[in-house]
């Protein structure tokens, strides 16, 4: 098996594994086992995530998609993993994960992806808060989710460049959330 892809845009192994795992929970237990093993191999030792994002036109957060996947894979062990993966998250750092992306031109097909980034980050932050309800990150994550939704939700219908696909992220990419 090859290595993971952590680049942004639509090439994101953690995002793909999250969706595949959600499907496999109902249809293919052996696939869940394989996905969990790969996720642990590829992401289990990640520490001190820098979160160098956004890059300008992606709609997925590589850092938060990874955290979302690991919340499902690790269960009760997720809190310990999260604390070393994003050790300053409770303090709102790295700031790039807590600050909604600014969309300068919603008619530009690439820049409009940043509304998608805000929506997918909101989904990830809400899921992380739900996975860690007693953790100090929970209220911080909920606030970040609300901020990201507020930045992009009102613009779902502003221009065709976003309208034709952004609603898919708003309705939640995963039936488990």
Tell where the protein language model's regions lie, with residue ranges.
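Long, repeat-rich segments with strong aromatic
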Residues: 36-151, 155, 159
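Aromatic- and glycine-enriched pocket-lining scaffold segments that form the walls
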Residues: 3, 8-43
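Eukaryotic acidic, Ser/Thr-rich intrinsically disordered low-complexity regions
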Residues: 160-172
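Conserved small/polar residues in nucleotide/adenosyl-binding loops
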Residues: 1-9, 170-175
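Tryptophan-centered motif/residue detector
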Residues: 10, 80-84, 165
């Amino acid at each position: 098996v090859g290595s993971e892809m952590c680049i942004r845009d639509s090439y994101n192994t953690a995002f793909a594994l999250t969706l595949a795992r959600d499907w496999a929970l109902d249809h293919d237990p052996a696939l869940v086992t394989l996905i969990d093993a790969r996720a642990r191999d590829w992401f289990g030792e990640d520490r001190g995530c820098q979160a160098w994002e956004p890059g300008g036109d992606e709609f997925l957060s590589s850092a938060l998609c990874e955290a979302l996947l690991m919340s499902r894979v690790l269960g009760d062990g997720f809190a310990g993993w999260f604390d070393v993966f994003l050790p300053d998250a409770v303090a709102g750092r790295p700031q790039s994960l807590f600050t909604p992306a600014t969309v300068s031109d919603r008619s530009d097909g690439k820049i409009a992806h940043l509304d998608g980034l805000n929506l997918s980050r909101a989904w990830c932050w809400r899921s992380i808060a739900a996975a860690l309800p007693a953790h100090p990150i929970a209220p911080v994550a909920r606030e970040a989710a609300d901020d990201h939704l507020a930045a992009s939700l009102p613009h779902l219908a502003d221009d065709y460049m976003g309208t034709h696909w952004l609603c898919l992220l708003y309705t939640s990419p995963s039936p488990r959330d």
